[in-house]
């Protein structure tokens, strides 16, 4: 089970939002590269970056901070990034910078042709982020609910050749209310590509539950507010996941 620390970037700082609200942000570090180093030293084997300004602006806004993180962690730690990725040139630039995976969210839902082109041009590097509330997909920084069912879109994108799906329950993100295990497993069972859980991770019990469903296709989990608030010790959680996996 991959435990993937999230580094959310706003105005060059590492922050956490409450339920995706840019006006409800807490700064956890003014040096995101140092934060990246901290998580790698604690045992992280992948990092999850979000360009929050980019997600709302529709184009990259924290490029300098992202490049600094990539320089800090080097080639050994895969880094995935979402937020403001709406064209092939942006993907190419990030991959040239050393990014392993780009996460396409809103653009995948609104412009599936772009996603298909991205999978052809950058096979193996494309992850789709599906954000949902009550099984319905949301777009535009969670501000718009669509009528699309998560599983239907997941299957469609799997056919395009995406690497994996990050599933976020936006009713729980940043609320420390526990992962929506049932919804995550339901999506994983509908697909053959891996699903990464996101939204609501709060304690070691969540880690135990996730490890129990890893065989269903749940590859990992994004670790956000809980590891910043101290509710979850990241190093202990990764050690627990490895122990349960017999690693």
Curated annotation (Swiss-Prot):
Enzyme superclass (EC): isomerase
UniProt GO molecular function: 1-(5-phosphoribosyl)-5-[(5-phosphoribosylamino)methylideneamino]imidazole-4-carboxamide isomerase activity
Cytoplasm listed as a keyword: yes
GO (cellular component) term, any one: cytoplasm
Catalytic activity as recorded in UniProt: 1-(5-phospho-beta-D-ribosyl)-5-[(5-phospho-beta-D-ribosylamino)methylideneamino]imidazole-4-carboxamide = 5-[(5-phospho-1-deoxy-D-ribulos-1-ylimino)methylamino]-1-(5-phospho-beta-D-ribosyl)imidazole-4-carboxamide
Chief location category: cytoplasm
Transmembrane feature ranges: none
Domain of life of the source: Bacteria
Record carries keyword Amino-acid biosynthesis: yes
UniProt protein name: 1-(5-phosphoribosyl)-5-[(5-phosphoribosylamino)methylideneamino] imidazole-4-carboxamide isomerase
Alphabetical list of Pfam families matching this protein: His_biosynth (PF00977)
Cited InterPro entries: Aldolase_TIM (IPR013785), His_biosynth (IPR006062), HisA_bact_arch (IPR006063), Isoase_HisA-like (IPR044524), Isoase_HisA-like_bact (IPR023016), RibuloseP-bd_barrel (IPR011060)
Subcellular location: Cytoplasm
EC number(s) from the headed UniProt entry: 5.3.1.16
Protein family membership: Belongs to the HisA/HisF family.
Active site: 8 (proton acceptor), 131 (proton donor)
Originating species: Variovorax paradoxus (strain S110)
Pathway of action: Amino-acid biosynthesis; L-histidine biosynthesis; L-histidine from 5-phospho-alpha-D-ribose 1-diphosphate: step 4/9
GO BP field: L-histidine biosynthetic process; L-tryptophan biosynthetic process
Keywords, ordered alphabetically: Amino-acid biosynthesis, Cytoplasm, Histidine biosynthesis, Isomerase
């Amino acid at each position: 089970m991959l435990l993937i620390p999230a580094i959310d970037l706003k105005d060059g700082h590492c922050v956490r939002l409450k339920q995706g609200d840019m006006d409800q942000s807490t700064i956890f570090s003014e040096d995101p590269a140092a934060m990246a180093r901290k998580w790698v030293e604690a045992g992280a084997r992948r990092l999850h970056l979000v360009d929050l300004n980019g997600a709302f602006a529709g184009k990259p806004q924290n490029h300098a901070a992202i490049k600094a993180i990539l320089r800090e962690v080097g080639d050994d730690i895969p880094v995935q990034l979402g937020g403001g990725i709406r064209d092939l040139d942006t993907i190419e630039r990030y991959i040239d910078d050393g990014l392993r995976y780009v996460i396409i969210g809103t653009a995948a839902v609104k412009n599936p042709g772009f996603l298909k082109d991205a999978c052809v041009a950058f096979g193996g590097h494309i992850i789709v982020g599906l954000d949902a509330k009550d099984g319905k997909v949301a777009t535009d920084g969670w501000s718009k609910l669509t009528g699309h069912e998560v599983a239907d879109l997941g299957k469609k994108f799997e056919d395009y050749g995406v690497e994996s799906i990050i599933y976020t329950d936006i009713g729980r993100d940043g609320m420390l209310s526990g992962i929506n295990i049932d919804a995550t497993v339901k999506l994983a069972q509908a697909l053959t590509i891996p699903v990464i859980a996101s939204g609501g991770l709060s304690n070691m019990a969540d880690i135990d539950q996730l490890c129990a469903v890893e065989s269903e296709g749940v590859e990992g989990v994004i670790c956000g507010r809980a590891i910043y608030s101290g509710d979850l010790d990241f190093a202990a959680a990764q050690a627990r996941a490895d122990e349960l996996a017999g690693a």
